[in-house]
Amino acid sequence: MSHGTYYECEPRGGQQPLEFSGGRAGPGELGDMCEHEASIDLSAYIESGEEQLLSDLFAMKPTPEARSLKGPGTPSFPHYLPADPRPFAYPSHTFGPDRKALGPGIYSNPGSYDPRAVAVKEEPRGPEGNRGTGRGSYNPLQYQVAHCGQTAVHLPPTLAAPGQPLRVLKAPVAAAAPPCSPLLKAPSPAGPSHKGKKAVNKDSLEYRLRRERNNIAVRKSRDKAKRRIMETQQKVLEYMAENERLRSRVDQLTQELDTLRNLFRQIPEAASLIKGVGGCS
């Protein structure tokens, strides 16, 4: 996996060091900043289109001790795993009518990559393109409709009874078909038609006891209403008698006031006193 254009800091035997076109900075300017760096030629990766650029860029640089221990047959990158000698087996299935299978020749030679060999499915653009879909695409709605059967809804001809439930007529479905969506379930047998009153025999003891309890409750409610009416009438009579007493008391006080006024008018001193008091006020 090593590349021929990868150069290390320490030159090997029979290999010329890499020279830069610009002037080299003195030891006083940069010091030992670039002592342990490695340089990579990116032109080979850009032209050939290989996918090992990031792995080579971030590969760990071997230490001087590791380089001194390497033998003549040791690879340049000790941290890489050895390649698998077994050939790569490509799958034999295809990806649908709209896609082409990737043959083994695509990865046999990394330098001969042809982007036209891989067919990329393009999505339709615009509102008209969304109507047609590929035959190999999966549609969950079509799957539910295919397995749930046909369902028809019967609407009444007139809207006179808005509370009347709709009748759902469902076609028979095969026994091997999976259950459909819970939104399309058939109506349960305990519907409105089965909610009728239970037939009770009027001659039975239970019916008689129930009627007797109902009659007792009705009589109690009627007696309670009668007592409330009598209490209300009694309170009305009491309020009327109190009103009569108050009226008689008002008449009595009015007569006493008139008598006192007549007495003060017959005494002249009292009349002048009353006039003087009235003038001062």
From Swiss-Prot:
GO terms for biological process: cellular response to lipopolysaccharide; DNA-templated transcription; granulocyte differentiation; macrophage differentiation; myeloid cell differentiation; phagocytosis; positive regulation of gene expression; positive regulation of transcription by RNA polymerase II. Residues 246-267 are annotated as: Leucine-zipper. Residues 208-245 are annotated as: Basic motif. InterPro entries: bZIP, bZIP_sf, C/EBP, C/EBP_chordates. Binds DNA as a homodimer and as a heterodimer. Can form stable heterodimers with CEBPA, CEBPB and CEBPD. Interacts with GATA1 and SPI1. Interacts with SMARCD2. Belongs to the bZIP family. C/EBP subfamily. This is CCAAT/enhancer-binding protein epsilon. The gene is Cebpe.
